[in-house]
From Swiss-Prot:
GO cellular component assignments: extracellular region
Species this chain originates from: Sistrurus miliarius barbouri
Enzyme class: hydrolase
Cofactor requirement: Ca(2+)
Protein name: Basic phospholipase A2 Smb-N6
Subcellular location: Secreted
Domain of life from the UniProt record: Eukaryota
Family: Belongs to the phospholipase A2 family. Group II subfamily.
Record note on cofactor: Binds 1 Ca(2+) ion.
Post-translational modification: Contains 7 disulfide bonds.
Presence of keyword Disulfide bond: yes
EC number of the protein: 3.1.1.4
Substrates-to-products reaction catalysed: a 1,2-diacyl-sn-glycero-3-phosphocholine + H2O = a 1-acyl-sn-glycero-3-phosphocholine + a fatty acid + H(+)
């Protein structure tokens, strides 16, 4: 699910795991 993936990315971004992923 793209929405679940987007949520996961946002959580990872908060943990600074993907600072280049701003979506």
């Amino acid at each position: 699910n793209l929405l679940q993936f987007n949520k996961m990315i946002k959580i990872m971004t908060k943990k600074n795991a993907f600072p280049f992923y701003t979506s």
